Curated annotation (Swiss-Prot):
One of its GO terms (biological process) is mRNA catabolic process. Keywords: Cytoplasm, Magnesium, Metal-binding, Nucleotidyltransferase, RNA-binding, Transferase. Pfam families: KH_1, PNPase, RNase_PH, RNase_PH_C, S1. Residues 562-621 form the KH domain. Belongs to the polyribonucleotide nucleotidyltransferase family. It is found in: Cytoplasm. Residues 711-721 have a biased composition (Pro residues). It comes from Prochlorococcus marinus (strain MIT 9312). This is Polyribonucleotide nucleotidyltransferase. CDD domains: KH-I_PNPase, RNase_PH_PNPase_1, RNase_PH_PNPase_2, S1_PNPase. PROSITE patterns: KH_TYPE_1, S1. Mg(2+) binds at residues 495, 501. SMART domains: KH, S1. It catalyses: RNA(n+1) + phosphate = RNA(n) + a ribonucleoside 5'-diphosphate.
Length: 721
């Protein structure tokens, strides 16, 4: 077997491409490698036509743990359901690819990117996106590419192209920019309250690098003798569109200009026009051309009616500057927000509404043991902030079976999660694991940004000391020729019939998350810059409304939330706290009825529903890890008597022995003649031997002259859930 090997020198690195060797039955395939990261990307098209008004494109990213030299956990020791990370990368591939396929195309297309080897210095996701474009071009599938993606990081004042995982964690920016020859088609970003100007410069920096990769793909096709397929749309029968334009335009325009009507009223009126039109056509003679057309394709009327509605709505925005609800192009819908709407069994809650979009967000405070362990190729091993987004069918007035979260729900949840992470307190300040759930109760556009706002309010209601409040809005765009209109706070119909969905989240200081998807083949950096700048006043307006509901964290936590104490010990003394076989730490948890977690770095977190019990456990651990010095004097309790001496607990959990010869200046025959178990005595540290054992003495010590602590008593507390 022989393939063709090509290489691209990019940003001082070599990207290696192998074509014609792997997956010979796919339309196109490429092994794309950089460093030790290797991905096989395939593109396959079937000749089967889907009777639908959308492109049946499937993009899958697969990662196998053998790529990192690991064996999966669980009984089966085999990969199961794709982890969240794989789902997000699948979406990252789909989003820039979808707008570049011809709008008329209805063939089933599947792109599969399989990560076969992972180098932590070279993240696989942007390679997978670029590889998807190459595989599609090699498969000679109609495609308005090439398309490529790069990641941009920011450390200090310097932009870094395609940073490693470690550099991403250290930096203030993680942005993926994907583009075509026509411009940028997708953006995905997380940032540490970065200014709008710095964000725009990062996008510009990224797109410059994208153009280099696009040129490399053009050169690759030329070297392989492959001609890019850009077939034109098939000739369509204009009979029905002409009929609809003549008979429905006036009615649709009247509906779109009724600015005071609700979404349901508008939808009903448009549906009535369509139904009446269908009835007129069905009343025609059987051999009528229109009637024959509809009998052959029952979806044709809905499809062409939607196209006409789209055309008229866009024309109204371009020519009149008016949207279907009467708002100006830069106007935000009516906002209402409230916090603490549920009983405090729920640790934090909030309701956020913008127009007809309504989101209920709840916050749960958990202990470190509630952190989510990550069993994927991500170097991070656990998550301590979780955001889950749910989109039930009733939120759009529909009925369908309730399923597990789909790709869209996972993606929206991850975006809102990313927007909040930069403002979360550090572990040592607030050691709780946080889970926020956003329930979309009503949807009419921008539910993910509604979830960002709801999450912020809910976290504050739970008493989480956020560094700043975060709000978000979705920006839209209508492009007709050279005419461009940017829309602020788009609603459902503007998202559905528009050209862009650009979600911008951030604080008063700057941006924390971006997500841009296109329905056209690209936009210039200047247009994207304009959208980002116009999002800022909208975000600040929303922040003001949120602050009216709650502007700082609640002073006290819910009485039903666990109480946590967090402090640091010497990492070398972790074994002392745990004890042989875990006996010491188990004894502390049983004695105080608490949960104790110790991280490798020495951070100890104690959880209890009773603050006094947590403080008692902390005192014991600090006693175990406190260094004792010769000559120190303590007052403690005799815990055990043995023939040669007595053991005294000088600190919580730490004992020393008084040899029988050190009990008194005079000769002692029996230990019990001087002390008994339970007696309180004052002792001096005589020596600490080479094995760390503490030897004590009563000789020459005035009783009740040392440091003492009250004997701890078990405190009954409610069990942790």
């Amino acid at each position: 077997m022989e393939g063709q090997n090509k290489s691209i020198t990019f940003d001082g690195r070599e990207i290696r491409l192998t074509t014609g060797l792997y997956a010979p039955q796919a339309n196109g395939s490429v092994m794309i490698e950089c460093g030790d990261t290797s991905l096989l990307v395939t593109a396959t098209k079937t000749t089967k036509k889907e009777v639908a008004d959308f492109l049946p494109l499937i993009c899958d990213y697969e990662e196998k743990l053998y790529a990192a030299g690991r064996i999966p956990g669980g009984f089966m020791r085999r990969e199961g359901r794709p982890p969240e990370r794989a789902t997000l990368i699948s979406r990252l591939i789909d989003r820039p690819m979808r707008p570049l396929f011809p709008s008329w195309m209805r063939d089933e297309i599947q792109i599969v990117a399989s990560c076969l080897s992972l180098d932590e210095r070279v993240p696989a996701d942007v390679l997978a996106v670029t590889g998807a474009s190459i595989a599609t071009l090699l498969g000679e599938i109609p495609f308005h590419g090439p398309m490529a993606a790069v990641r941009v990081g920011l450390i200090g004042d310097d932009f870094i192209l395609n940073p490693s995982y470690r550099e991403i964690e250290k930096g203030d920016l993680d942005i993926v920019v994907a583009g075509s020859p026509d411009g940028i088609v997708m953006i995905e970003a997380g940032a540490n309250q970065l200014s709008e100007q710095d964000t725009i410069e990062a996008i510009d920096f990224g797109y410059e690098s994208v153009t280099e990769l696009i040129k490399s793909q053009v050169d690759l096709l030329k070297d392989l003798g492959i001609k890019q397929v850009k077939s034109s749309a098939p000739e369509e029968d204009n009979t029905l569109p002409s009929y609809l334009e003549k008979n429905c335009t006036k009615g649709i325009e009247l509906v779109l200009k009724k600015f005071d009507q609700s979404k349901d009223e508008r939808d009903l009126e448009l549906e009535k026009i369509k139904v009446d039109t269908q009835a007129k056509i069905e009343s025609l003679k059987d051999d009528n051309e229109l009637k024959v057309l509809l009998s052959e394709n029952d979806k044709l009327l809905s499809s062409d009616f939607k196209k006409l509605t789209k055309k008229l709505m866009r024309s109204q925005i371009i020519n009149d500057g008016k949207r279907v609800d009467g708002r100006e192009l830069d106007e935000v819908r009516k906002i209402s927000a409230s916090a603490g709407i549920l009983p405090k069994r729920v640790h934090g809650s909030a309701l956020f509404q913008r127009g007809l979009t309504q989101v209920l967000s709840t916050t749960t405070l958990g202990t470190p043991s509630d952190a989510q362990e990550m069993d994927d190729l991500n170097p991070s091993t656990e998550k301590t902030y979780l955001h889950h987004y749910n989109f039930p069918p009733f939120s759009v007035g529909e009925t369908r079976p309730m399923r597990t979260p789909g790709r869209r729900e996972i993606g929206h949840g991850a975006l809102a999660e990313r927007a909040i992470i930069p403002v979360l307190p550090g572990k040592e300040t607030f050691p709780y694991v946080l889970r926020v759930v956003s329930e979309v109760l009503s949807s009419n556009g921008s539910t993910s940004m509604g979830s960002v706002c709801g999450s912020t309010l809910s976290l504050l209601d739970a008493g989480v000391p956020l560094k700043a409040l975060v709000s978000g809005t979705a920006m839209g765009l209508i492009k007709e020729g050279k005419e461009i209109r940017i829309l602020t706070d788009i609603q459902g119909i503007e998202d559905f019939l528009g050209d862009m969905d650009f979600k911008v989240a951030g604080t008063e200081k700057g941006i924390t998350a971006l997500q841009m998807d296109m329905k056209i083949t690209g936009l210039s950096v200047s247009v994207i810059s304009d959208a980002i700048k116009k999002a800022r006043p909208a975000r600040l307006h929303i922040l003001e409304k949120m602050q009216e509901a709650i502007d700082k964290p609640q002073e006290s936590l819910s009485p039903h939330a666990p109480r946590l104490l967090s402090f640091r010990i010497d990492p070398e003394l972790i074994g002392t706290v745990i004890g042989p076989g875990g006996r010491t730490i188990k004894g502390i948890t049983e004695r105080t009825n608490t949960k104790i977690d110790i991280e490798d770095g020495g951070i100890v977190t104690i959880a209890s529903h009773d603050g006094a019990a947590a403080e008692e456990a902390q005192k014991i651990i600090e006693g175990l890890t406190r260094k004792v010095h010769e000559g120190e004097i303590f007052t403690g309790v005799v815990t055990r008597i043995i023939p040669i001496g007595a053991f005294v607990e000088i600190l919580p959990g730490k004992e020393g022995m008084v040899h029988i010869s050190q009990l008194s200046e005079a000769r002692v025959e029996r230990v019990e003649d001087v002390v008994r178990q339970g007696d309180e005595v004052t002792v001096r540290v005589r020596e600490i031997d080479s094995r760390g054992r503490i030897n004590l003495t009563l000789r020459g010590v005035s009783q009740n002259s040392g440091m003492s602590y009250p004997e701890p008593t078990p405190t009954p507390v409610a069990p942790l859930n």
